[in-house]
Amino acid sequence: MAGPAERTGASPAPAELGAYVALTALGLGLRLYDLGSRALHHDESLHALFAWYLYQGRGYAHDPMMHGPFQFHALALIYFLFGDSDATARLLAALCGTAAIGACYWLRPWLGRIGALTAALLLTFSPIMLYFSRFARNDIIIAFWNLLIVLGLWDYVARRRPAALILAAGAIGLGFATKEVTFITVAIFGVFFGLRLLRELFEAAGPDPAAALRTLTSPAKAPLYLAPLVVVGGLSLPQFSAGVELPAAWLGFGPLAPNPAYPPPWAGLAAGGLAGALVAGSLGAGLLGIRPGLALGLAVLPFGAVFPLAPAPPDHFQGLLLNLALYGGAPPSAWG
């Protein structure tokens, strides 16, 4: 993928930059004008009320019916700063909708100057986007997080900047804290980057398919290919814990198990033995000067996947074993 400099050329002209500033300012005005005159929708009333409870010091308890906690904490902060009213209940949505307009400026490397400016224009005047930017629900907030995910991951693919991955990781985390629809977002990006990874590996390998595997397992090159997948998959992996509740119950532990005794006596011994074996193997590999390879990665992967997904064991050994497995899985020769 061509880098941003190759696609956009020189810095934007003052008129182009001014157009984004004007559209963003106009979008803000359209979203703030008469913001509190319309009666609150049922969903808006729930978000406004429970955020007000938090603002009043009555605490917050997560309820999946109203999705993630981000909106309630952000609205409570807005109440603290600007007071509580129907207008301030919608202020978060208005700000996110406005920020999405300005963010189109950074889409120029991929949409082109005309395309990015057109996107900003459409976001400014779109009746649907304008409506949800004046609606105290998570729709426009999620749309803004998704736009930041696109900007972060696409910029990383183009320029390999760690800051771009941090942006994407933050947006994914905030997306999960806002609404469960982020599962779908992660699935879309995961499929895309998985297919892109395969294409790049086979292009780099040429007529030798084994070269693709060597690239994927190379300590020097693997991070460049796998970092977006690690961000997308790693942040979302613990969110899929419900998918292992039934298998855990079949094994005799977890909240769905018929026996309330949890965990079973053998769970700690089994997990500790596996973690110890992985750490011992990785230390031995480091002493022998062996770089981490496919075999070691495959050995660590199941343990690293099961522990974030499994119903949480008691804290006194959960963190210890998880850290031993994940950080001990790479031999010392790979740390420096």
Question: Can you annotate each of these PLM segments?
Answer:
Residues M1-L296, F303-G336:
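Membrane-integral, polyisoprenol-dependent glycosyltransferases
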